[in-house]
Amino acid sequence: MEVLMAERPTQVFHNKVIDGTAMKRLISRFIDHYGIGYTSHILDQVKTLGFRQATAASISLGIDDLLTIPSKRWLVQDAEQQSFILEKHHHYGNVHAVEKLRQSIEIWYATSEYLRQEMNPNFRMTDPFNPVHIMSFSGARGNASQVHQLVGMRGLMSDPQGQMIDLPIQSNLREGLSLTEYIISCYGARKGVVDTAIRTSDAGYLTRRLVEVVQHIVVRRTDCGTVRGISVSPRNGMMTDRIFIQTLIGRVLADDIYIGSRCIATRNQDIGVGLVSRFITFRAQPISIRTPFTCRSTSWICQLCYGRSPAHDDLVELGEAVGIIAGQSIGEPGTQLTLRTFHTGGVFTGGTAEHVRAPSNGKIKFNEDLVHPTRTRHGHPAFLCSRDLYVTIESEDIIHNVCIPPKSFLLVQNDQYVESEQVIAEIRARTSTLNLKEKVRKHIYSDSEGEMHWNTDVYHAPEFTYGNIHLLPKTSHLWILLGEPWRYSLGPCSIHKDQDQMNAYSLSVKPRYIANPSVTNNQVRHKFFSSYFSGKNQKGDRIPDCSELNRMTCTDHSNLRYPAILDGNSDLLAKRRRNRFIIPLESIQEGENQLIPSSGISMEIPRNGILRRNSILAYFDDPRYIRKSSGLTKYETRELNSIVNEENLIEYRGVKVFWPKYQKEVNPFFFIPVEVHILSESSSIMVRHNSIIGADTQITFNRRSRVGGLVRVKKKAEKMKLIIFSGDIHFPGKTNKAFRLIPPGGGKPNSKEYKKLKNWLYIQRMKLSRYEKKYFVLVQPVVPYKKTDGINLGRLFPPDLLQESDNLQLRVVNYILYYDPILEIWDTSIQLVRTSLVLNWDQDKKIEKACASFVEIRTNGLLRYFLRIDLAKSPISYTGKRNDLSGSGLISENGSDRANVNPFSSIYSYSKSRIKESLNPNQGTIHTLLNRNKESQSLIILSSSNCFRIGPFNDVKSPNVIKESIKKNPLIPIRNSLGPLGTGFPIYNFDLFSHLITHNQILVTNYLQLDNFKQIFQILKYYLLDENGQIYNPYSCSNIILNPFHLNWYFLHYNYCEETSPIVSLGQFLCENVCIAKKGPHLKSGQVLIVQVDSVVIRSAKPYLATPGATVHGHYGEILYEGDTLVTFIYEKSRSGDITQGLPKVEQVLEVRSIDSISMNLEKRIEGWNKSITRILGIPWAFLIGAELTIVQSRISLVNKVQKVYRSQGVQIHNRHIEIIVRQITSKVLVSEDEMSNVFSPGELIGLLRAERMGRALEEAICYQAVLLGITRASMNTQSFISEASFQETARVLAKAALLGRIDWLKGLKENVVLGGMIPVGSGFKTPSSEPNNIPNNIAFELQKKNLLEGEMKDILFYHRKLFDSCLSNNFHDTQEQSFF
């Protein structure tokens, strides 16, 4: 420094700190004035001075110097409290996932930034000479961000793909990291496996693809003769002077530049620093420059279109491989950028919005016409200012005026009282060049299972008109109605029907399949059971376990009913086709010692409601005739007198009738216990055939015998049956009969041994083996069954019904279900005897069928259901009549156990029109609906007060029943309530009964009002609102199981039922914490399933908020599983300050994978754009210019996007390199099928210039469309198949080239390297022999004329850019990227 000062006569002393930026400027001035050699000598002295001063200061660093900021604890607690409130809002459906993520990131980012700002004052006050504090601002090593991670908090991190991890690292490196925080930190590590592997491989592969695309681009000519250019102008304000200078330096002008009448630059002149300075000084007209886009060469480039060489300040030399230079220039920063700047370990850096706070307490006022309601990016309601808004805050003594800039959010309402320092507005942060936001997709996945519904209209995306992709036009909720879908493979069938209820341990899809306690909402559409029941049950087949069927199951959760009947030898597939459903009746006759089964009495009525003669109306399975162990059943039967005529021995659709083979009188029969094991063929059996074993003997590896006896092994198909016969073995001299039953004391009279027996015995003759003639006798004990009367079904019905009258007769019949003399039961439970109630009527009547339907009787708010059976003739010939005009059909007010209406005292008839009786609070009115216009002839009611028993809720142990409300409200007649949480629905899946609701509002009672509906609903169904507001039954939603835990029952007390407004309607969706009445319970989120007098049932649902433009995956009512994609948001997010995000972005642009959302009315915009182009320019040139502009603007947009990524990382890449790449991926066109050409085949990819030249040569229009090829696809569509084969898919490319007979002219570098030839660049480059100056005069004159025409076209295309830009800006949203460089 002394030498410098001695040689400078005028010494200047600057007393200020020189940081890194000032040092760069100083060194640059040294180089300009003294040269490189003298500057390096000066810098060596500066280095020596620095080392000397650092040694004298002797600064050291220890762990004690890392002082944690005291305010960190309460700052982190405040951020956690805000995050908890945010999570609650997301759970309620007030904010969606993107808003939650965005707000969570900003909460923690603001906390981290505040800690970083507190770091300097804390050090200054506590320890100003702290080594950490001094080093953090020296610029030599480390920066403030790294010190902040040491003593503040690490904050938010980015993953390898650049996506934000919303779990912040609250600890700093001084305190130490937890295991989770350490794993998250590993993503941003410098030399970690994640960092090195992902970045290096991605950058290397990107470079390889780029070089593949442009390896053949070589400078081969001086001038291609183009007259086209790209206009660049700094006037529009979208381009800074620095970018303007970088764009122009090294280029060649495409036209002369004039200032007034003076020409300051000529065509084909290269642009240097001096010329650019004159452009900026004089603010010249838009400058037209030559670029690789405008070069007319097909497979190379000319000197003037490329410009100056990057290595020296002169035009690029001929033979320069500019393509490979371009590819490496773009790919190289990806591998090197991580070593350039200080590495902060993937820590997220972003920006927060500025807040405007109230200066004092007061009332706020503003002009409401200048704002419109919207949502902030955090999901809060706000007003958006369209222009400057003046807000007045009136306090007691002073009035404050605050100006809110445009595009800001106002967070308060007009005339609202605000407190001092309260945030009243939010100003959007201005986007800078180095901190640009990007659009990303965020997929939201379902975290529960159920049906999807929405409560707004949706649009189909244009490309998914017939798919399940929908676009949301406005903010609304998507609902997942909770349920448990069945996952079944093809083949197994469900035995459940719609609205059935299931037992906790029940048979649902496969035999012995355990299902959750739930209520099904399933339409049977699949195979009914399994292959066991595909046909008739032959002797010896295994019968699955049916012990749980056909009964009311009393579990811990609720009293439920099992849905189907399974007979051992019935064809269940035929049953499913008959669409049979069952109504269970549970009856308790108080005071009588009747045998009432747990299963109750089941009624079986076909879905179409038509009953034939001798149909089984009700049946009862006696539990004493159910065998739950394996064995043989021996019957002794005799035929009953048939109650069916021979001509009626046909099976009517949907009805079970008596066949003579079923009509066996129940005589005593016997059960012979036998132990049976069904084994697979591969099982290793540890006992031998015909061996005798004891009890508890090991049979297979995991099975032991329960009893001892003789072992027989039988093979059948792919299974083995191992049978153990218990009993005694005898070897008599002669055996007369093979099988025989011996009663107690039976046998030979002289036999003393058999006289001592007190039990039945079963004797059967057996062979030791198939080939021996010797027999032995096996004597087994027998369990006898005696005939019992069983339950008297007649006691359940009024005595009039059991008397044979002129109309209907009911007859009790006991019969056995199986007619085989010997029935084998293997490992199962089976019903042997059934008691049935048979419906019949007079044989003389020419009536072939009866119609069954249901009647609802409402008495004092208590609903009862009765069965009505009508004898009906053909509906066409019937004429109605009424015998008893006084029969009003009213039930007496005392509500006795027996219905006081004599079923046969009157015959009701109705007209064909539907009866529209309103829900009247009068007592005892019978509401009914005719069965699809079928006429009625007679009425029969099978009833007792306990037929449809509704148990008290006190017996129910389902956790979702609010028991506290039961205790608080003892006045509620819970016993009379109906619903899914009681003993089950009284009616299951019966389509004939409907609930009539009129157009007016209906008072069910005087303390609850239902909203008015205009639909007719089926009773006790799930009513859902579709997107048009119509209420319907979701028959399309099959195989969904409603768990009782998903149904919440809310009781309304009498005191506030009167205050309930009709806001709760059927099918309505309610968010959590909504109160439907004063002092009422706070509801959980869900859909109103049933509205009753004193309660509502709400099905649990999970709301998901979605904003306009979101993409919904799936159809309305579709069943979703956990983890399915529900909705996709497209939102803007800040880019982290690391190249990790840059590389995927560059690759995304160059591979042409767009993530920009498509406008929902894009087609209308394009139509309008075409019309405006036609109107401005006239019809002849409109579409030509439109196609030209499309290609030019797409190329410029791609260049700008790539440059934006690299400039945000501080990397300077010249536009020419990117332009060469973009030129190659946009230079192909796709030949279309319109007006098919004789030259190219449809679908063929050809070069754009080649297509234009071929069209001019043939004087024929070639129809094509421009396509954007990604760099991978462009590498596979070149003129050299050797280059393509060396890139990827070698065998396929070579085989295809051989079949097509392609010729490789070896013009590129790579194909010559592969074949060992001289590469056509550098010294191997040969100058073209034909130069433009050797052209004859006549051809030159024609070229000159042609150039004049092209100049006129250029005037139209490029000198009227303002016209096109205004048109484009009105039709495309991304005007910045489409404007200029």
Curated annotation (Swiss-Prot):
Its EC number is 2.7.7.6
Q: Name one GO molecular function term.
A: DNA binding
Q: Which cofactor does it need?
A: Zn(2+)
**What's one GO BP annotation on this UniProt entry?**
DNA-templated transcription
> According to the record, how does the cofactor bind?
Binds 1 Zn(2+) ion per subunit.
Per UniProt, subcellular location reads as:
Plastid, Chloroplast
User: What protein am I looking at?
Assistant: DNA-directed RNA polymerase subunit beta''
Which species is this UniProt entry from?
Lactuca sativa (Garden lettuce)
